[in-house]
């Protein structure tokens, strides 16, 4: 084991956040070493229990720009203009995310993104070691032991500081807990998810509209499909763990076929391997992680899902983690010692992480229960009118979170005010013909200040 340099950082986890942080820090002169428990996905293929599709929003793209990684990533992304809502009876309807094609989100395959960021991290000067599972940490001595699970051989290092970018099941978080309790709490949803696939057409290309997130809302449960650049869609079914229907009552491939035939009839013929994939892919858990502390003075820090994992229903987990990376790099520039930088990072990000965790839970209810509800559709219509009239004051929730980089905590607070305005203004109305615009103008100007960045 060799001594560490004064500007060296050791990252645990070479996933998306770990690789992006490695790029940012290496470009700013840090000596960065990354340890990853799995093998190199560029050699052995990508392995993960995580969702294989992600939604990239403006705040995530901004972070990629800071790392010089945007062009490499966007070459692999597919534009999504909005939600294509599929009712049980009737034709699908597109609900645009924004005003035009300047306000869209992007679907990207997790494996392609991870490989692109890995390449860029190594090009920036970071050293990445694979098959290194964190086993033991001596925080006082600055010592860590890793195990290569191929041969059970230990590998020991000295470190100045550890940064945990190793996800919701973080090994570094577990080690920190043993040293000093972090107040860890995880609240699991009573729903889980399972992933399936829509293959491309025989001659290539998408079987359904490729530039949309497809959504089949069914009250207590729902199905979504996100496009990939190869013409496939990743389909995710979110279903209760108990009750009818649920994962408890839909265990076999044949039971899954019956569920889709009844509740998702237009999706069923698009998924030829439904029976096989249902039986091969175990359900994934959905939960929200909170901690009282994210760091151990200057010796260790958690970022991204390792610090604040969230449910996936706002498509912001990766975007939030990427924001973490930029915020941490900035705090490291602004402070002379790691303990101060880590404390400032946590103070800057804690409220925003809690806000997007709450909004992600709320968005699940909207997606599964409300997108085909007449009251919701009327409120959405009014929201668009209010944005057109007062674009810097009445900024839709989705715009603040996805197309702008408004702090999540500010977006949450403004969204709650705007929701109240929409509900009160549309109560008792079937359309907008009798809306009192003068009264609404007074309410909007009284309750909503102009928002930085809105236009």
From Swiss-Prot:
Keyword terms of this UniProt record: FAD, Flavoprotein, Monooxygenase, NADP, Oxidoreductase, Pyridine nucleotide biosynthesis
Stored InterPro entries: FAD-bd (IPR002938), FAD/NAD-bd_sf (IPR036188), Kynurenine_monooxygenase (IPR027545)
Disulfide-bond pairs as recorded: none
Enzyme Commission number(s) of this protein: 1.14.13.9
SUPFAM superfamilies the UniProt entry points to: FAD/NAD(P)-binding domain
Any matching Pfam family: FAD_binding_3
Cofactor(s) the record lists: FAD
Catalytic activity from the UniProt record: L-kynurenine + NADPH + O2 + H(+) = 3-hydroxy-L-kynurenine + NADP(+) + H2O
Pathway: Cofactor biosynthesis; NAD(+) biosynthesis; quinolinate from L-kynurenine: step 1/3
Transmembrane segments: none
Ion transport listed as a keyword: no
Broad class of enzyme this protein falls into: oxidoreductase
Top-rank taxon, per record: Bacteria
GO MF terms held by the record: FAD binding; kynurenine 3-monooxygenase activity
One BP term from GO: kynurenine metabolic process
Primary role: Catalyzes the hydroxylation of L-kynurenine (L-Kyn) to form 3-hydroxy-L-kynurenine (L-3OHKyn). Required for synthesis of quinolinic acid.
Family note: Belongs to the aromatic-ring hydroxylase family. KMO subfamily.
Protein name, entry field: Kynurenine 3-monooxygenase
Organism per entry: Xanthomonas euvesicatoria pv. vesicatoria (strain 85-10) (Xanthomonas campestris pv. vesicatoria)
Taxon lineage: Bacteria, Pseudomonadati, Pseudomonadota, Gammaproteobacteria, Lysobacterales
Gene name tied to this protein: kmo
